[in-house]
Amino acid sequence: MVFKRKIYSKLLDWKELSSGETAVMLEGARRIGKSTLALEFAKNEYEDYILLDFAKENNDIKNIFLENLSDLDAFFRNLFLLKGKKLKEKKSVIIFDKVQLFPQARQAIKYLVADGRYDYIETGSLISIKKNVKDILIPSEEYRLKMYPMDFEEFLWACGDEVTMPVIEDSFKKKKPLGEASHRKIMKTFRTYMAVGGMPQAVKAFTEGRPFDRIDFIKRNILDLYESELAKYDDENKEKASVIYKTIPEQLENKNSHFRFSLVDKSARYKNYVEAVNFVAESMIGNECINVTKPEIMLELFADRSNFKLYLGDTGLLVTQIMKNADETAENLYKSLIFDKLSVNQGMIIENIVAQMLKVSGYDLYFHEFLHMPNGSDKEKKYEIDFMIVKSKKICPIEVKSSGYKSHKSFDYLIDKYKLKTSDKYIIYTKDFKEEDGITYIPLYMAGLL
């Protein structure tokens, strides 16, 4: 089963605009559908293709890259001979799948693109890419596209639903509530998406009517794969990325979700673990959210990287991690989450899905922690804005509520302290759309529209 993915249109743009002058690199975590997408695109948009899967190719294929790059006529002659087909020039594509496993193929892109006979699509897991490029020249002829797990709309498409998202978009655009019945139905579907997640294998199992035990088993295998790859990186670089990754659910259970190194090692300090944290975030299996010391438009200039939160890249994987040691069956636990009856801290799941949706929408993730003395108080208290983004050249603060709770003290004190001119102020919560007191309240499923 091949799912419809939004990034397909970006590949079309690359093909048209590049005109063979760059290769495209699909970057992302393992098991998010990069290889499937590349193959589907090759079948649909070219007359012919060759797939080089470097997890399977033998040394004969690899030796072509090592021995024939100085003579590209010989390179293609030997490649076509070993693959049993000849490609039409200017009408065909060659896929370098899992290129991280054979960095010399990636380095060859510079010469192959300059040659101009064929287009090239590369796919790679960022965990392995980052550790395997130390000794090669990264080609400037690469156009990189970041790919993420399936978002809510893609999940709806996979379920055969082309109706729901246009309704959500219309409500958001017109700033009108959907109505209780429609909102309740969409929230149930969205909770199902949170539970299943956006990993294509898990979504496929769900659309086939498989039990949640089976879906959870698939996701556990993906988590094990991530942890084993991180462990390999740790062994080679004397880092603790695998430990950092494993503690994410426990970190998010903290009252304010801030990352505490004491949960990794009681004597741990940021400076000793900064590379491991960066590796988890840059590998796109985790989403880092950084504190800014001032709510200014150039948020990155005020980033305090030692004060951060770390979310999982896919909320469905977080759900599986949370439920790992639960006494109940996965079937019962998943249904409890879908029907909003789960006894565990749902706030961490909801905050994680909002972080994921904002990241997929193209935002870097920041939050703001500040001290303020409210009127009538004799001492400063600490407050926090969950997320801060920039829209229309103005700061846009975002608060996330795991229920219908509408308190907005943090917004009020933020405006009071900094005399801030904001774009919009959003509270993302579990109820229907509404506007009140200068604040826009949007349901969880609209977070990706910001």
Task: Identify the residue ranges that each predicted region occupies.
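Pre-Walker A adenine-sensing motif
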Residues: 2-18
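A cross-kingdom feature that marks ATP-driven nucleic-acid transaction machinery
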Residues: 15-22, 29-31, 40, 44-47, ...
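Conserved lysine of the Walker
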Residues: 34
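Conserved catalytic segments around the Walker B and adjacent sensor/switch elements
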Residues: 43-61
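Short glycine-rich substrate-engagement loop in P-loop NTPases that contacts/grips substrate
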Residues: 56-89
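Structural recognition of the conserved hydrophobic beta-strand(s) that form the central parallel beta-sheet
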Residues: 95, 119-125, 146, 155
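Short regulatory helix/loop adjacent to the ATP-binding pocket of P-loop NTPases
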Residues: 111, 128-144, 156-161
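Interdomain hinge/linker elements that couple catalytic modules in large macromolecular machines
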Residues: 162-350
